[in-house]
Structure formats: C-alpha cells, structure tokens
C-alpha cells in the first residue's frame, strides 16, 4: 500500500495499491504522484476496487448493463442506446442532407424486432445505476476493441464522465466513441489515451472542423476512407476508427 499526494504538495493524501495502468494516465512508482491528478480521488478508489478480488463478475455486470452487441463487422463488442433519445441527432433527423436524416439505427433490425428497442431503453435506464461504471468495465475489460453507441449517443455531461471512467478502468481496451453531442465533449486533457472520441460532421459531405481533434463524416461521393464496403461490410484488419493517428474517417452513406 502506498500514498499519493498532489503535485503541489498541499493536497490530500490518497491511499492506493500497486498500480499498473498503461492508458489511464496513472503509472507505477514515484511518478504516480503527479500523474494521479488525471484521476480524482473517487476514480483512484474505483480503480482499486475494480482490481481487488471482489471485482464484479460478468453475470452480475450484465444484470446492470443489459446485453451488448457482437456483429460480424466489428473486431469487438459494441453497445447501443435508442436513437430516438439522441439530443442533437434527433433534431438533425428532421433535416434533409444530414447523416441522421436517414439514420440506420431507426430502421432495419432496430425497428423490426421490438425486443431490440426494449433492450436499448433498458440500457438507457441502466446508466443511472450507481454501479454502472463498474459493471461496464467488468464486461469491456476482456475486449481489445470496443465501440460505444452503434445506435444512440451521449445523453449528458454526467454520462460522458461515466464513459471516461469506464475507459480509465479498462486501459488495455481501445475505445471508439462517435458523437454529434458537441455540448458534452470533455476537456481534451481529460480523454484517456485508450479512447478516441470522433465528432461527427452534421452534414453529408460536410466541411472539416477545427472544433475537435478527431472527426468522422459521411459522403455520397468518392471521399470514403472506410474500407468496409469493399470488404463485405467488415472491418477485417482496419482499425482507423480507434486510431488516434487518424484524424478523420469518412464513411459511405448507409
């Protein structure tokens, strides 16, 4: 058991166990005292509890989070919420020329099977559960790659902070979060190294923006950079969406 003081030397001491975190901003040894500032005290204790013997089992976690999605396209699990509850996306869905106007998450299997929509609303409600962060991390930590919201989007600043916590607790998983919710974007320095948040362009063939470091867009032309349509709809060995060195990913219109 060790102790961490903030970098000013005047802050509270926080007890911690031996930590090995590659992507969360915490490191082992002496350097931990300053880098621990990337997590508040609650986050540190969350990490400790998560890695102790009493960590949540998958079966218990799924009772809180509800089910995840495993598609043949993706290299790992994904997670969906109801597209009807998108804050910005629902407004854009009324506007021709936006990706949300013909949103794939409001047609096909998403609407064909009532059980899918019901599960999405259960997941939406689950975000309020006090153990949601721990439960999500318990399931996701076994994944090399994870996609947030193959349907739906971030609901609030509090929801975004919870997502950041999940990413910090799963440093060996690469996370990809596409979003239209500009008002919920965190400060860039708060984003863990293992998370890529891609701000979605609001118009098809829309212009690039300097509002955020990573973007995604939709095209009806030849500017597509996502190879999935040429690979029977699969990612195969492509990981552009999860790669922080790739600033922009352009998809073909669904």
Question: Where are the regions a protein language model picked out?
Answer:
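Intrinsic disorder/low-complexity segments
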Residues: 20, 26-29
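Basic polycationic patches enriched in arginine
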Residues: 3-5, 30, 49-52
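Cationic, low-complexity basic patches in intrinsically disordered or flexible, solvent-exposed regions
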Residues: 18, 39
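Short, positively charged and aromatic/hydrophobic N-terminal segments
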Residues: 40-41, 46-48
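Class I S-adenosyl-L-methionine
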Residues: 50-254
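Short, low-complexity, intrinsically disordered N-terminal modules
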Residues: 12, 17, 30-33, 48
């Amino acid at each position: 058991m060790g102790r961490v003081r903030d970098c000013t030397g005047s802050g509270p001491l926080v007890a911690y166990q031996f930590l090995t975190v590659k992507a969360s901003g915490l490191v082992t040894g002496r350097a931990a005292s300053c880098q621990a500032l990337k997590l508040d005290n609650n986050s540190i204790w969350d990490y400790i509890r998560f890695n102790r013997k009493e960590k949540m089992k998958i079966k218990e976690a799924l009772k809180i989070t509800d089910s995840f999605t495993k598609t043949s396209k993706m290299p790992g699990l994904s997670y969906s919420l109801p597209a009807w509850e998108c804050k910005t996306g629902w407004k854009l869905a009324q506007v021709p020329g936006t990706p949300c106007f013909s949103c794939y998450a409001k047609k096909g299997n998403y609407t064909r099977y009532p059980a899918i929509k019901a599960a999405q609303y259960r997941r939406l409600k689950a975000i309020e559960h006090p153990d949601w962060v721990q439960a999500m991390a318990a399931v996701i930590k076994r994944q090399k790659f994870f996609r947030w919201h193959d349907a739906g989007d971030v609901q609030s600043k509090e929801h975004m902070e919870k997502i950041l916590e999940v990413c910090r607790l799963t440093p060996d998983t690469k996370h990809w979060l596409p979003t239209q919710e500009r008002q919920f974007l965190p400060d860039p320095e708060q984003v863990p190294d293992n998370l890529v948040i891609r701000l979605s362009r609001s118009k098809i063939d829309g212009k690039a923006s300097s509002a955020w470091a990573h973007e995604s867009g939709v095209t009806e032309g030849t500017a597509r950079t996502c190879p999935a349509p040429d690979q029977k709809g699969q990612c195969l060995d492509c990981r552009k969406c999860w790669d922080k060195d790739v600033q922009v990913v352009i998809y073909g219109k669904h």
